Amino acid sequence: MEIFPAIDLKEGRCVRLYQGEFSKETVMNEDPVAQAIIFEKFGAKRLHIVDLDGAVAGESLNLSVIERICKAVRIPVQVGGGIRSLVAVEKLFSVGVDKVILGTAALYDKTFLEEAVLLYKEKIIVGIDAKNGFVATRGWLDVSEISYIDLAKQMEKIGVQTIVFTDISKDGTLGGPNVEQLELLQKSVAIRLIASGGVASIQDVKKLNDMNIYGVIIGKALYEKTIDLEEVLEVTKLC
């Protein structure tokens, strides 16, 4: 199982939100580059970055920070948030990003998504964020009428190889992942799944590993120290 320490960017800082609420923001580190270096130092093999400002604005607003992170670490970095054109995708790749995560565009601009997948194949990940089972977009501010399962099936037909699935109600809560929704997703599509939201303990990670989930994104648990990064990396390596 792959472990993805998370860095959420807002106004150039590393923050955490609670259940996706921008008003419930906690600054975890004023210097996201330093945070990325810390994660790498403790053994992280890859990083997950979300441009929260970009997710709302529809364009990357923390590109300079992302570029500095990519230059500061030697591990692969995947980035999501506000990526809604091929130009935006190419710009991120040009500054050193390894993979990009498309969310809103996956629902509302299938032509762009198909072009991106055709050009960059496994480098394109789709992020599916669900609120009560329905897909949320534009920084989780809007909720659509399409279920997360239906969107995942559409993504599979297009050729998407990896999905990041987030249950928004779990995000930032340390309440444990939504195992039921993940199990249903696993039964519905044959795509690699990265679980996000609510992971609070080594036991949570072990449960997801036992389910053969490809990867897990860990945010608040690392910052609050309910999960030790070195320990979880060792545990998943042995599984």
UniProtKB/Swiss-Prot annotation:
EC number annotated for this UniProt entry: 5.3.1.16
**What are the protein's GO molecular function terms?**
1-(5-phosphoribosyl)-5-[(5-phosphoribosylamino)methylideneamino]imidazole-4-carboxamide isomerase activity
Compartments in which it is found: Cytoplasm
What are the protein's UniProt keywords? Amino-acid biosynthesis, Cytoplasm, Histidine biosynthesis, Isomerase
Q: Catalyses which reaction?
A: 1-(5-phospho-beta-D-ribosyl)-5-[(5-phospho-beta-D-ribosylamino)methylideneamino]imidazole-4-carboxamide = 5-[(5-phospho-1-deoxy-D-ribulos-1-ylimino)methylamino]-1-(5-phospho-beta-D-ribosyl)imidazole-4-carboxamide
Gene Ontology CC terms, in alphabetical order: cytoplasm
Q: Could you mention a single GO BP entry for this protein?
A: L-histidine biosynthetic process
Recorded protein name is 1-(5-phosphoribosyl)-5-[(5-phosphoribosylamino)methylideneamino] imidazole-4-carboxamide isomerase
Organism lineage reads as:
Bacteria, Bacillati, Bacillota, Bacilli, Bacillales
Query: Which gene carries the instructions for this protein?
Result: hisA
